[in-house]
Amino acid sequence: MKKGITLILSLVMAVTLLAGCGASGSEDGSAESGDTAEVQLSGAVALNGSTSMEKVVGVLGEQFMADNQGVSVTYDATGSGAGIEAASNGRADIGLSSRAVKDEEAASGLVGTTVALDGIAVIVNAESAVADLTVEQIAKIFTGEITDWSEVGGAAGTISCVGREAGSGTRDGFESNTDTEDACKMDQELTSTGAVIEAVAGNPNAIGYASLSSVEGKDTVKAVTVGGVECSEATVLDGSYEIQRPFVFVTKADAELSAQAQAFFDFATSTAANDLIRAAGAVPVAK
């Protein structure tokens, strides 16, 4: 009889355990955790545009790929104008521009989202005696009204102006801040930020302009103060440094981004990216 009771109790316990297991699963017997499975991203994200944004998109892309190993972020440094066009015609998921989207571009269906701010540093050769210029002096130098360094406190020598090509976001930002649109007289018009820095570094009488993020750490050129104000993250953010511009992601209003491109966009425009943007020498704006 004891054996019979023991067997019955064992059967009851087994049924109870099975019932408990069934209650924690779905109707088809599969377990449900209650948590949505994490989506694994894959595919490519194509970025195209501003050469000045190279450091910023470089660190953002590297971090995003480290966090999402199935995704490849590519960057084609073509300049702001070409990047905006690439976003418009679908050759890029996200266009990169170092100027704001113009009214006519917005009217065509493009949307600009500011990722960061960047100071445009006015640079001279590292050996130059000139350390400070006003916005007015800078404008007069680039429009040809001031032609010799002795006119602004430097050693005598004919000033050589180095700038970017038409369509460059850096050039657009520089000219709009110095009120020199279509008036600059360049000795050299170059197609990348790096080329401008290299040209100024190689000519003791040269002056140029370049992204703050590209100039930091360079000992072959120096950034002059503008009206006594240094070009830095703090002075760009508080507005006291006058020559600055935005770093912008350009997308199409009527086109949905791929899952991986949208995830990259969301990451780059969030506070999670602030330290990376700052480390790249730009000023984050996400709050």
Question: For each of these PLM feature ranges, what is it?
Answer:
Residues 1-11:
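Positively charged n-region of N-terminal signal peptides that target proteins for export
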Residues 4, 22-287:
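Exported/periplasmic ABC-transporter solute-binding proteins
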Residues 14-15, 130:
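N-terminal hydrophobic signal/anchor transmembrane helix of membrane proteins
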